[in-house]
Structure formats: C-alpha cells, structure tokens
Amino acid sequence: MAVTRRKVLVGALVGSGLTLGFLLRPRSYPLPLEPREGEFAFDAWLRIGTDGVVTVAVPQVEMGQGVTTLIPQIVAYELGADWRQVAVEPAPVSARYANLPLAAKWAPMWMPLAPSLADDTDGVLTRRWAEGHRFNATADGTSLAAYEAPARAAAASARAMLMQAAAARWDVVWEECEAHG
C-alpha cells in the first residue's frame, strides 16, 4: 500500500474529526444528591425537606478554612432561608463538583506536554479532564472560586421555583413574592 498525499490528508482529517468529536461530545452526569423521604433535590447542591430544613452538600474537606460554613451561608443567603434551618453534609464524589480552578492551576501535572492549553478555567480541556476524573481535591484556597457560582445558581433557581409554587397557590404574580426564612 503506497502512501500518497491524498491518503495522508484523509487520515489527518479523519483523526482530527474524531478528536474534535470526542472533545465536544456533550456529557451528562447523574444527580449526586438523592432526595430522601419528604425532600426535594435542587441540582447537585441542596435538598429542601417538607419540614423546611435545607441540606447543603459541601464537596470540600473541612480543614480549618471554614468551607462547611461558607458554602451553606451562600446558599442560605441566596435562597432566603433561615440559617438555623440549614444543615450540611459532605458531597459524594461526582463530576458535578469538579474543582476547575485547581485543575487549571495543576495542569502541568496532568498535562505536562502542553500545560498552557489549560490556562483558562472554563477551557474545554480543563473541564473534560476535571469532570472525567471527578477531580474533587481540596487545596490552594479554591473553594470559593470553584463552588460559589454553581451553589448560588442552584439556590437561586430553587428560590424561584418555590416562589412560583407559592404564587400559584396564592394566585399572585410570582415576581411580587419575596423569600424570607
């Protein structure tokens, strides 16, 4: 079999297409928090019980940095919940809790040939690697940078859903409702 320029180009195009298809293939991960009896799960971050207790999943290990207070306070504030009704539990290992800022900082260890490709914390390579390896490491003070936005978004969406449910029950416009305690 002779190697021709056409065969080399076809091989390069096929290989590039397969690589690009693999990198851009959408991935979904199961919800790591299973609601218990009388609870409802909102994304990977919180469960709300019918008794009003809000349980927040914390994917970092508490080593004196206050992460088991910080993330639940963010959720409670965004949700409009009473702080006395907030419980904390360790999050299970899951791709949903991938620590992207730390994965980008540690890129020279997991991608030694081209670490500069992982400089952007929202980069495709960093996200694919961190989620694919369920990278949930606690280090380098990245708890707030890694988890504030997704925890806040989960709490905000839960607050909006609860306000919509209350508005439907009270027959008012949900934008007029406020969440307190």
Give residue spans per PLM region:
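Cofactor-binding beta-sheet edge motifs in enzyme active sites
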Residues: 2-181
